Amino acid sequence: MASTTPITMEDLQKALEAQSRALRAELAAGASQLRRPRPPRQRDSSTSGDDSGRDSGGPRRRRGNRGRGQRKDWSKAPPPPEERQESRSQTPVPKPPRAPPQPPQPPRMQTGRGGTAPRPELGPPTNPFQAAVARGLRPPLHDPDTEAPTEACVTSWLWSEGEGAVFYRVDLHFTNLGTRPLDEDGRWDPALMYNPCGPEPPAHVVRAYNQPAGDVRGIWGKGERTYAEQDFRVGGTRWHRLLRMPVRGLDGDSAPLPPHTTERIETRSARHPWRIRFGAPQVFLAGLLLAAVAVGTARAGLQPRTDIAAPPAPPQAPRAHGKHYGHHHHQLPFLGHDGHHGGTLRVGQHHRNASDVLPGHWLQGSWGCYNLSDWHQGTHVCHTKHMDFWCVEHDRPPPVTPTPLTTAANSTTAATPATTPAPCHAGLNDSCGGFLSGCGPMRLRHGADTRCGRLICGLSTTAQYPPTRFGCTMRWGLPPWELVVLTARPEDGWTCRGVPAHPGTRCPELVSPMGHATCSPASALWLATANALSLDHALAAVVLLVPWVLIFMLCRRACRRRGAAAALTAVVLQGYNPPAYGEEAFTYLCTAPGCATQTPVPVRLAGVRFESKIVDGGCFAPWDLEATGACICEIPTDVSCEGLGAWVPAAPCARIWNGTQRACTFWAVNAYSSGGYAQLASYFNPGGSYYKQYHPTACDVEPAFGHSDAACWGFPTDTVMSVFALASYVQHPDKTVRVKFHTETRTVWQLSVAGVSCNVTTEHPFCNTPHGQLEVQVPPDPGDLVEYIMNYTGNQQSRWGLGSPNCHGPDWASPVCQRHSPDCSRLVGATPERPRLRLVDADDPLLRTAPGPGEVWVTPVIGSQARKCGLHIRAGPYGHATVEMPEWIHAHTTSDPWHPPGPLGLKFKTVRPVALPRALAPPRNVRVTGCYQCGTPALVEGLAPGGGNCHLTVNGEDVGAFPPGKFVTAALLNTPPPYQVSCGGESDRASARVIDPAAQSFTGVVYGTHTTAVSETRQTWAEWAAAHWWQLTLGAICALLLAGLLACCAKCLYHLRGAIAPR
């Protein structure tokens, strides 16, 4: 965190005396300069630092040299007082008498103004970097393009009244990771990481140094340095803090703006002064705009604005139908009753769930049935040729099971004891022989509708319900306006505050999947503007209006300025002839180097190059969980790397023994002796206390009775075996990770167009060649990247992290957000926990699993000779230190930072009429998977032939154009197999696995009356004008501008006829 150096009283006294003499000399020199007339202030960078520390009125106390505009290394110490005195003034200044000794105090500096230091609000401080931000500390401004040092150490001071006369010196530095600081709004980039220099200070000093404090007591100046003084309390103890400030201010000295000149053209006319006073064109345009807004507001207030069209849905009974409605309300619609849920469908001779049988686009909506009271006819919907059709069945017998009837309208529920239908599929046949193929389910719009369906038969007829109509009304003739529903079609889905709307419903605003409906003038104006002024319309207006306005301005300026004849001649007679393209050819090119195609000239992808701005982020060594051990056919007396040198390797054992959080265990397996000797079991119980008493060791000694001792074989009467294991977290010398930051990344595509080399990027996707212009649809660049170059025992590989790391969010503990060293000698992260060792037999079922985090399993292995055994060691993950380990890098990075989503699109424009070659050979290995006449696109894949683009057709229907090579697309199929595929010439048969629509289809059932309404297709001129009012308005404006332009040109030609056509 920081380094502390206690200062003694004697050192402090000497420093204060030397500083006092220097400051007095500076004050005397400054006072003598103030008496003389001051030269005008310059903007030079060499004098900006001296002037910034002085005020214009009177000999005020000096606030220090802020050094604005200077490009010095602010980590260096200032020059001695003698050099400063000689450089400032050559006149001798009498030295004041020495000040008497004073009690210990902070370094004497000249006070300035007080105030509050602004600082960014980045939340509560969780690390030293955020704590520095919280207390207003800012890094020095650094330009990454210059050859300036990336690190600079500065010194701050910290002392407390409770600590006596001890002053703590805090050294810290800022590291620039290569991004430009954002100093326009007073903030700085979070990528500038804050890192203190030196070892860890005492805990209470760190807590006091990182304590946020916003109040600034004063600004101190010491030579060429500037400090901010703060005092605060931590746990009842008052602390003082002097923070070093940047040498250059955040605002800086900006250059003056260049002079601006405005040229005014006189437009007054002595003959027609009213044109200037009243502004007739402006009045006309304003009136036209108000008229358009009024028309749009009126149209939006009388009818809803719909953005999407609703598909057909079950029809509804008339609102005055049935005697059951006479008891409640004559305008209530008849709602469906509860039916069966789940949807069991009959497919062939079997019943299956709807979710297993339904086509894809039907699963996106609801499916089911309405149960209505009148059973004179039933209705269902069929789907074929990607359209919905209504089917009607007449004379359906009524049910015999009475159930309560429920109606709901305007949040009113009532039950009527009447004869009600049974579940919706009751009374239907289980099989249907001659039904129409291609039937599908119906989709309901409201969550309150029941969902059920079954395969039935019916006549194929088309039907359409009357449309929904609205009106506007007011309560008691006063605002606000309300929307009243005149007729409602339930499948439109209009709701008021979540409740379905019915005829007679009044609501301020209605909402449906089709749009919004309102009578409020403000809402109507917004709806009219949002629906009429779309992005396409705005672009069309700009494209149509801006060129005419520019030409009008050019002609008007040419008529009123000198040199009008030459300007108008250049515009009218010469003009500008844009290049005339004979033909545009479009094709695709794969993204692998070496791919080629015809456009119609040959185009080949020579290579792909990756460019970026690289900033070195340092190098670190990850923690490595390393373990070793040995299986010994006796009981050793010296359990250490030296005592077990014959069984364990010396170098790894020493590295592990000297590692961090060492764990070592010595197991005595079934330790006993026979043939008259005493039992050795108690020699290792409890916890090997007797063994450690005679053989001191730093490892744990544990008995392992019951474990297999077959590894040491050949001694049927006397078997002694022991296992030693050692594990710890170490810094492996051959495992390092180097971090590099890639900013301003760009992908360069190297193309060869008819032998001419060309490079295209996202910024410049064009190639201008002698044969024509080639426009390339280039994928977007990957953005900022972080490269981890991992070197593990000679095997080097790179991993890439997408985007910049969020070091103040979830990535605060990642390796990239830590401070690294150039020589890879620094371990990343906190010290891991101690690993756990475990002895496991070879036949233990535990070996079927993997060791847990921080666990090491050791298993004895039978040797090839007597009294020879080995050891199998399995180490698990790194425990809680995984975030600093290679596993974290693999989990948060990728091996390929950039992969294009598809082929490159090539648009070739040539000045000569050409014909793009088309492939005539049939495609190969074409497979069709899915269904036909079901509304779901089928999957079509295969290989397109060479020789040009393949315009693929399936049974005569166009599917799309594909470059040579493999293609995968989706297409709606209307014909059954077999499928003939072609590229425009010879055809071939494709293999197909499609679903039979007859076995796939089913119907949703609707019981009740059926109302048929045929919509008229005639349209009056007034209706057409109301539907195209925006286009008419835009056309009228363009016509007026064109008329004004022609009049202006005619007037200019009349006055300049002598210059254009002299007699």
UniProtKB/Swiss-Prot annotation:
Annotated GO biological process: clathrin-dependent endocytosis of virus by host cell; fusion of virus membrane with host endosome membrane; virion attachment to host cell
Residues annotated as site: Cleavage: A300, G301, G582, E583
Listed transmembrane segments: 535-555, 1029-1049
Disulfide links within the chain: C153-C197, C590-C595, C619-C824, C641-C653, C699-C712, C758-C767, C807-C817, C931-C934, C950-C983
Region named Human C1QBP/SF2P32-binding: 30-69
Post-translational modification, as annotated: Structural polyprotein: Specific enzymatic cleavages in vivo yield mature proteins. Two signal peptidase-mediated cleavages within the polyprotein produce the structural proteins capsid, E2, and E1. The E2 signal peptide remains attached to the C-terminus of the capsid protein after cleavage by the signal peptidase. Another signal peptide at E2 C-terminus directs E1 to the ER, with a similar mechanism.
Extracellular face residues: 301-534, 583-1028, 1050-1063
Descriptive protein name: Structural polyprotein
Organism: Rubella virus (strain BRDII)
